[in-house]
Amino acid sequence: AAVPSGASTGIYEALELRAVEHINKTIAPALVSKLAMQEFMILPVGASSFRIGAEVYHNLKDATNVGDEGGFAPNILENKEALELLKAGYTDQVVIGMDVAASEFYRFTASAGIQVVGDDLTVTNPKRAASEKSCNCLLLKVNQIGSVTESLQACKLAQSNGWGVMVSHRSGETEDTFIADLVVGLCTGQIKTGAPCRSERYNQILRIEEELGSKSFRNPLAK
């Protein structure tokens, strides 16, 4: 029930909402959006360069807010609306990645042709994740695992189970470019390092590509 917080019962009196029902039906809907996804990411799987990802990113220029990792944080309420924003005219070359933070998504690994990337699960207990087939790709965060040696071991464990490996930064970390060298050295073919405006790692990958020349990795799905 709505109970006046003081002696006055006037229309401007602040109300103290004591019942849990008010929290569930009044407060929560006003504060929490309907998005079930933490992040929507662009994966230019058919690209031969960074251009496609950058163009999709710039297609979102009307969004006003920018998140911690350089991604746009527009005021949207539904998942479908977020997916519509990511359209930029490419077909069969760009796919959408979603950070859903859902413990139930492991069921998809056996029934659907999608990549399910394990985050905290693979850091805390990678052997259990592999044995239970909870996911099919490792999100490799060096500063979360603890050391480069342990990161290499985790990568080998994942690959020995037929998993993919995605090298990743962590929110709030420095501009150090080491993970760009790591993703090339491990030949994982996947990196998660924020939006193009956070360009340090992308520039390092471009420098590596320039140095390697014809020996550099080429996306087999590029058109």
From Swiss-Prot:
Modified residues (N6-acetyllysine): 25, 61, 87, 133, 141, 215
GO molecular function, one term: magnesium ion binding
Cofactor, how bound (note): Binds two Mg(2+) per subunit. Required for catalysis and for stabilizing the dimer.
The keyword rRNA-binding appears for this protein: no
Sequence positions that bind Mg(2+) 2: 99, 119
Positions where Phosphotyrosine occurs in the chain: 12
Cell membrane as UniProt keyword: yes
Catalytic residues (positions): 69, 141
Domain of life: Eukaryota
SUPFAM superfamilies the record matches: Enolase C-terminal domain-like, Enolase N-terminal domain-like
Cofactor(s) it depends on: Mg(2+)
Modified sites of kind N6-succinyllysine: 87, 215
Location of the protein in the cell: Cytoplasm; Cell membrane
Protein family membership: Belongs to the enolase family.
Subunit description: Mammalian enolase is composed of 3 isozyme subunits, alpha, beta and gamma, which can form homodimers or heterodimers which are cell-type and development-specific. ENO1 interacts with PLG in the neuronal plasma membrane and promotes its activation. The C-terminal lysine is required for this binding. Interacts with ENO4 and PGAM2. Interacts with CMTM6.
PANTHER family: ALPHA-ENOLASE (PTHR11902:SF55), ENOLASE (PTHR11902)
UniProt function note: Glycolytic enzyme the catalyzes the conversion of 2-phosphoglycerate to phosphoenolpyruvate. In addition to glycolysis, involved in various processes such as growth control, hypoxia tolerance and allergic responses. May also function in the intravascular and pericellular fibrinolytic system due to its ability to serve as a receptor and activator of plasminogen on the cell surface of several cell-types such as leukocytes and neurons. Stimulates immunoglobulin production.
Protein name: Alpha-enolase
